[in-house]
Amino acid sequence: ETWGKDEYEEFAKDFLYADGKLEKTSKSLPSLSWYRILLERETWEPYAVYYQKLLSGIKCFPVVSDKKEKEGISFEDSWGMSRSYGGKRLHEGTDLMPPKNQRDTFAVVSVCDGVVEKIGWLELGGYRIGIRSKTGTYFYYAHLSSYAEGMKQGKTVKAGELLGYMGDSGYGAEGTVGQFPVHLHFGIYFYENGKEISVNPYEVLLFLENKKLIYSYF
């Protein structure tokens, strides 16, 4: 699926209209609402550029699917929902749930070509890895159980390359596991004038659903 310049512009307007929480209807590119008609070009144009960079750089779904499992990887639109661990905050990502609650089983891969910018433990994210794409988008993968061999800061990765395995690490001191079910927290960030902007990954994951890598886990 490819989009033209006008479609990226509509995508950006939808993003602003919904305070960053893009709806499933965004891809259908509905007629402009009065709100979007009144948006000044300088307000939405930067976001159109960001989405064009984001979508032109991603190539595959972030979790390798099991060809024998009918249910596969599931996810819901949970971006912006309330979280309480570590203080009241909003969920800045989408949680991808495996068909079986088994850590160190389901492979997590890079959705794009890029460079490992961050890696290691975070209290909230557990064992996490952050990839900066060639077009400047930052992709955040959290709660891993382990990393792929040789994965380190500064390493160049290709789309589809193994980053590590889905787990349940986080919410405590380094090595903490079992505070929640096994899953991958997947986040996307833009940077505008030095400010980090969290983007709802849900629509992007829908975009990537037909770009899954397949493997026989069981």
Set out the residue ranges of the language-model regions:
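Surface-exposed, glycine-biased beta-strand/turn segments
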Residues: 11-127, 159, 172, 213-218
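Long amphipathic alpha-helical coiled-coil/heptad-repeat bundle
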Residues: 1-4
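Residue-level detector of conserved, well-ordered beta-strand and adjacent loop positions
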Residues: 97, 132, 142-145, 158, ...
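Short nucleic-acid-contacting surface segments enriched for D/E, G, S/T with interspersed K/R
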Residues: 150-158
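Small beta-barrel nucleic-acid-binding modules, principally OB-folds
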Residues: 89-101, 130-137, 188-197
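Zn2+-dependent peptidoglycan hydrolase active-site motif and core
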Residues: 109-150, 175-183
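Acidic, glycine-rich catalytic/binding loops that coordinate metals and/or anionic ligands
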Residues: 158, 165, 179-218
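Short hydrophobic beta/alpha edge segments that flank linear recognition/processing sites
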Residues: 128-131, 158-174
